[in-house]
Amino acid sequence: MKKIRRSIIAAVTIAACSSMLPAESYAGNGCGGASWYALHSKTASGERMNPAILTAAHRSLAFGTKVKVTNRNNGRSVVVRINDRGPFIRGRVLDLSRAAAQNIGMVSSGTAKVCYQVIS
């Protein structure tokens, strides 16, 4: 009886701990690489890409989601709206419009380490 009880407690504990996600892997918050792009074609949401607007691409966040993006190198932040899918390069979490990249000081480097947080 005690062995069964211990087995059940161990199974429940393992299941509970394995379902917890670290903050960085939650789709609403994260850190990783970002790049910028300035296409003039349509985005995955169907709107025309405008490099002068504060927008970004993310693999899974809903279109229209507002996200605060902070450049980890200089602390500068910008709020962008998700309107596209991507990036599809390992280690990158966001593709920013040129205007958004300019606001956080990453146009010349092309890429930067960023953290992002969903705000609405």
Task: Please provide the spans of the model-predicted regions.
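Secreted/periplasmic proteins
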Residues: 2-120
